[in-house]
Amino acid sequence: MTQTLKYASRVFHRVRWAPELGASLGYREYHSARRSLADIPGPSTPSFLAELFCKGGLSRLHELQVQGAAHFGPVWLASFGTVRTVYVAAPALVEELLRQEGPRPERCSFSPWTEHRRCRQRACGLLTAEGEEWQRLRSLLAPLLLRPQAAARYAGTLNNVVCDLVRRLRRQRGRGTGPPALVRDVAGEFYKFGLEGIAAVLLGSRLGCLEAQVPPDTETFIRAVGSVFVSTLLTMAMPHWLRHLVPGPWGRLCRDWDQMFAFAQRHVERREAEAAMRNGGQPEKDLESGAHLTHFLFREELPAQSILGNVTELLLAGVDTVSNTLSWALYELSRHPEVQTALHSEITAALSPGSSAYPSATVLSQLPLLKAVVKEVLRLYPVVPGNSRVPDKDIHVGDYIIPKNTLVTLCHYATSRDPAQFPEPNSFRPARWLGEGPTPHPFASLPFGFGKRSCMGRRLAELELQMALAQILTHFEVQPEPGAAPVRPKTRTVLVPERSINLQFLDR
């Protein structure tokens, strides 16, 4: 009976979206003819380059997705030098493409990050590896990160980090001009929180990011994280030959990654030495100790260079994802006090009567409004506004045949702000995830991706965000800076606030 119901639900799901899929694919007749790349509409190369370099398009790539869909439809083509990119901005077409993926989906193969690894003879981690190496790393890490119970295992560690964040927010209030409860540049504080949290999980040790005096090497790492995304965007936009004439972006990218690798190496070696001392010089055997690095270090098939590459890249991923999403969440909650009040009530109701303990990871994952707030923030401000694929075979996308080895960009920002999927798409409305209004296409908002290339740290990031929001709203009422203008997002490889977000944290 259970299997029958599961099968029926899958069939219902496919039938339900069949009309939209057919419309998006342009199937007017059963024998609709497929068309080639030459038939795909798009901007001329001069106008595309002018948009990127003369009109600030590099920092507005997310907005260009929306403009492209409005001007050319759900599929368009743009050329930059010898590189042709197909842009896909309809949920049904995104689904069609992703469901044609093979066992080892490839992303943009000319990443400057991969080039840095090659130049410095560094091993690639999960973010930069491709092919068999990527598949091996993902198979190794998936049981440690993707399963819900695996993330919940770190709840105690993360709870301690969140408590330190609350204390730091208290200390940071009233510095400089403005109201006494104002904390300036909350994203900067949450960068420290993100690094402390992911390091506690990866290394099983604390870095002191949330102390009154932040260690200098930690500040250097955080600056490198912010800088590397800017230099990545500039480097990818430049032809390779131009680096000799304008060496700045590539030089900064290498410097930033060198600093991050040096930071990770110091802490990996320290962690390895501590583990050896605890075990009398023998490898650490406790694979349930809660530190992912224990799993990395003492599996013979993972070389030391691969351990370092993975730790460095996971530290980077953990910092930016959590810090930006938490900044946007509190920004929107401060501007929508009715949602903040309802969420505070939901969180306090989950506390045990007479208990000062915070809700457990299991309880937090069952709070509907809390989950809806996180989903709505990620819909409005996806950390990665667009994803890329390089198919290893010819694929069909709507009316078109996309040849293998063609770069395809999935426009997640455009689909998540599509008014056909989300009424009032630019409004913060968590209730849309609680049954209010039409149900969007399941591929309309994919902040963590889909399939084999989906975000490995999704469970951990969701838990960290839920715990941080729960504790912050338990202690503080969050209000906007008086007289502050709205903050818009900008592209810096990832989506970030265009300027500092300043918020008031008033004691409850």
Swiss-Prot record:
<keyword id="KW-0809">Transit peptide</keyword>
<dbReference type="GO" id="GO:0005506">
    <property type="term" value="F:iron ion binding"/>
</dbReference>
<dbReference type="GO" id="GO:0030282">
    <property type="term" value="P:bone mineralization"/>
</dbReference>
<dbReference type="GO" id="GO:0005739">
    <property type="term" value="C:mitochondrion"/>
</dbReference>
<comment type="function">
    <text>A cytochrome P450 monooxygenase involved in vitamin D metabolism and in calcium and phosphorus homeostasis. Catalyzes the rate-limiting step in the activation of vitamin D in the kidney, namely the hydroxylation of 25-hydroxyvitamin D3/calcidiol at the C1alpha-position to form the hormonally active form of vitamin D3, 1alpha,25-dihydroxyvitamin D3/calcitriol that acts via the vitamin D receptor (VDR). Has 1alpha-hydroxylase activity on vitamin D intermediates of the CYP24A1-mediated inactivation pathway.</text>
</comment>
<keyword id="KW-0472">Membrane</keyword>
<keyword id="KW-0503">Monooxygenase</keyword>
<keyword id="KW-0408">Iron</keyword>
<dbReference type="GO" id="GO:0034341">
    <property type="term" value="P:response to type II interferon"/>
</dbReference>
<dbReference type="GO" id="GO:0030500">
    <property type="term" value="P:regulation of bone mineralization"/>
</dbReference>
<keyword id="KW-0349">Heme</keyword>
<dbReference type="GO" id="GO:0043627">
    <property type="term" value="P:response to estrogen"/>
</dbReference>
<comment type="similarity">
    <text>Belongs to the cytochrome P450 family.</text>
</comment>
<dbReference type="GO" id="GO:0062185">
    <property type="term" value="F:secalciferol 1-monooxygenase activity"/>
</dbReference>
<dbReference type="GO" id="GO:0030308">
    <property type="term" value="P:negative regulation of cell growth"/>
</dbReference>
<keyword id="KW-0479">Metal-binding</keyword>
<dbReference type="GO" id="GO:0033280">
    <property type="term" value="P:response to vitamin D"/>
</dbReference>
<dbReference type="GO" id="GO:0006766">
    <property type="term" value="P:vitamin metabolic process"/>
</dbReference>
<dbReference type="InterPro" id="IPR001128">
    <property type="entry name" value="Cyt_P450"/>
</dbReference>
<dbReference type="InterPro" id="IPR017972">
    <property type="entry name" value="Cyt_P450_CS"/>
</dbReference>
<dbReference type="InterPro" id="IPR050479">
    <property type="entry name" value="CYP11_CYP27_families"/>
</dbReference>
<dbReference type="GO" id="GO:0070314">
    <property type="term" value="P:G1 to G0 transition"/>
</dbReference>
<dbReference type="InterPro" id="IPR002401">
    <property type="entry name" value="Cyt_P450_E_grp-I"/>
</dbReference>
<keyword id="KW-0496">Mitochondrion</keyword>
<dbReference type="GO" id="GO:0042359">
    <property type="term" value="P:vitamin D metabolic process"/>
</dbReference>
<dbReference type="GO" id="GO:0032496">
    <property type="term" value="P:response to lipopolysaccharide"/>
</dbReference>
<comment type="pathway">
    <text>Hormone biosynthesis; vitamin D biosynthesis.</text>
</comment>
<dbReference type="GO" id="GO:0046697">
    <property type="term" value="P:decidualization"/>
</dbReference>
<feature type="binding site" description="axial binding residue">
    <location>
        <position position="455"/>
    </location>
    <ligand>
        <name>heme</name>
    </ligand>
</feature>
<dbReference type="GO" id="GO:0005741">
    <property type="term" value="C:mitochondrial outer membrane"/>
</dbReference>
<dbReference type="GO" id="GO:0045618">
    <property type="term" value="P:positive regulation of keratinocyte differentiation"/>
</dbReference>
<dbReference type="GO" id="GO:0070564">
    <property type="term" value="P:positive regulation of vitamin D receptor signaling pathway"/>
</dbReference>
<dbReference type="GO" id="GO:0004498">
    <property type="term" value="F:calcidiol 1-monooxygenase activity"/>
</dbReference>
<dbReference type="GO" id="GO:0020037">
    <property type="term" value="F:heme binding"/>
</dbReference>
<dbReference type="InterPro" id="IPR036396">
    <property type="entry name" value="Cyt_P450_sf"/>
</dbReference>
<dbReference type="GO" id="GO:0055074">
    <property type="term" value="P:calcium ion homeostasis"/>
</dbReference>
<keyword id="KW-0560">Oxidoreductase</keyword>
<dbReference type="GO" id="GO:0036378">
    <property type="term" value="P:calcitriol biosynthetic process from calciol"/>
</dbReference>
<keyword id="KW-0443">Lipid metabolism</keyword>
<dbReference type="GO" id="GO:0008285">
    <property type="term" value="P:negative regulation of cell population proliferation"/>
</dbReference>
<dbReference type="GO" id="GO:0006816">
    <property type="term" value="P:calcium ion transport"/>
</dbReference>
<dbReference type="Pfam" id="PF00067">
    <property type="entry name" value="p450"/>
</dbReference>
